[in-house]
A protein has these predicted regions:
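Beta-strand-rich modules
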Residues: 134-153
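Short beta-strand segments within Ig-like beta-sandwich modules, predominantly Fibronectin type-III
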Residues: 123-130
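Carbohydrate-binding surface patches
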Residues: 1-42, 76-80, 110-111, 151
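Extracellular Ig-like/FN3 beta-sandwich strand-entry sites
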Residues: 78, 113, 139-141
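Short strand-edge motifs at loop-to-beta-strand transitions and within beta-strands
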Residues: 67-69, 79, 131-133
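Pro/Thr/Ser/Gly-rich low-complexity, intrinsically disordered linker/stalk tracts
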Residues: 85-111, 149-155
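Solvent-exposed loop/turn segments flanking beta-strands in beta-repeat/beta-sandwich domains
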Residues: 108-121
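Acidic, Ser/Thr/Pro-rich beta/coil linker or hinge segments at domain junctions
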Residues: 26-74
Length: 155
């Protein structure tokens, strides 16, 4: 079982303390916060945009101590907290090959694979669910990384 909550702050930056001492799973009564909450922040003044519409990276975790946790909320923001994640590195993508202006690779067999991020010379150039990409013959050092459902990026 997992816990996910959204904290919306419509005013100036502040810190809030949340009492989670009574949160229990529905089945066996054990505390719901079995691991730290992953923290993702969306700020109105600084929207998380990138050219490829990738999910934004988490901005750390929050751990409950003594049945409470404290979270800093930026001004005019939404902070999303969840235990629904696995912190891991997806498997490396193999078979990356550039031939005739087309970059191709072997499909990921990772259990929670969602899409790929493609890099040329260390700079992201695309996000795709496909296993090939027309790069118009652009030379460079290419890398393809698997991204899983928890937004973990492979090596």
């Amino acid at each position: 079982r997992s816990v996910s909550i959204a904290l919306i702050n419509r005013g100036p930056a502040k810190t809030v303390t949340v009492d989670c001492s009574t949160w229990r799973t529905r089945t066996d009564g054990t505390p719901s916060l079995h691991q730290p909450l992953r923290r993702i922040v969306y700020e109105a003044a600084n929207p998380p945009l990138n050219a490829f519409n990738d999910l934004q990276a988490a901005s750390g975790t929050v751990t409950a101590t003594g049945g409470v946790f404290t979270v800093a909320l930026p001004a005019k923001s939404m902070t999303f907290l969840t235990t629904d994640y696995i912190d891991r590195t997806p498997p490396a993508v193999g078979g990356v090959e550039l031939k005739g202006g087309v970059l191709s690779w072997t499909a990921s067999t990772g259990p929670a694979h969602v899409y790929y991020r493609v890099y040329r010379d260390g700079v992201q150039i695309a996000s795709t669910v496909a296993t090939r990409l027309d790069v118009k013959g652009a030379k460079g050092d290419y890398a393809v990384r698997s991204v899983d459902r928890w937004n973990n990026v492979g090596r």
